[in-house]
């Protein structure tokens, strides 16, 4: 017997993320925009890998995002807007996008597009 399909997909995603992390790293001027997607929520952080700190974060668990009507993609758009606002407050305008091994589509693309529309460059 082999592994379940969901276990294989998870391991494959983690391998993709490990390959991606070999090539990218965040700095003070250009932090890494890290995305984590679960079945229900989406989380995003700006990480400075030089000293291992989180500069800013946003999530669909926050109360102003939870109250939104609509689907998960609409919440992802709002999270993208929030992280762009918080990055501006921290004087950050350019980031390195780390999609976490997830395919660039759906909620991940919606979050990235919303962050770009609100002033983040990547």
UniProtKB/Swiss-Prot annotation:
What InterPro entries does this protein's entry cite?
Ribosomal_uL18_bac-type (IPR004389), Ribosomal_uL18_bac/euk (IPR005484)
Q: Return the protein name.
A: Large ribosomal subunit protein uL18
Pfam families the UniProt entry points to: Ribosomal_L18p
Q: What does this protein do?
A: This is one of the proteins that bind and probably mediate the attachment of the 5S RNA into the large ribosomal subunit, where it forms part of the central protuberance.
Q: Which NCBIfam families match?
A: L18_bact
Give the molecular function GO annotations: 5S rRNA binding; structural constituent of ribosome
Similarity comment text for this entry: Belongs to the universal ribosomal protein uL18 family.
Q: Would you tell me the Gene Ontology cellular component terms? A: cytosolic large ribosomal subunit
Q: Which UniProt keywords apply?
A: Ribonucleoprotein, Ribosomal protein, RNA-binding, rRNA-binding
Q: Which domain of life is it from?
A: Bacteria
According to the record's subunit comment, the protein's assembly and interactions are: Part of the 50S ribosomal subunit; part of the 5S rRNA/L5/L18/L25 subcomplex. Contacts the 5S and 23S rRNAs.
- Give the species this sequence originates from: Mycobacterium ulcerans (strain Agy99)
The cross-references to CDD domains, in alphabetical order and at most eight, read: Ribosomal_L18_L5e
- Keyword RNA-binding listed: yes
Biological process terms from the Gene Ontology for this record are: translation
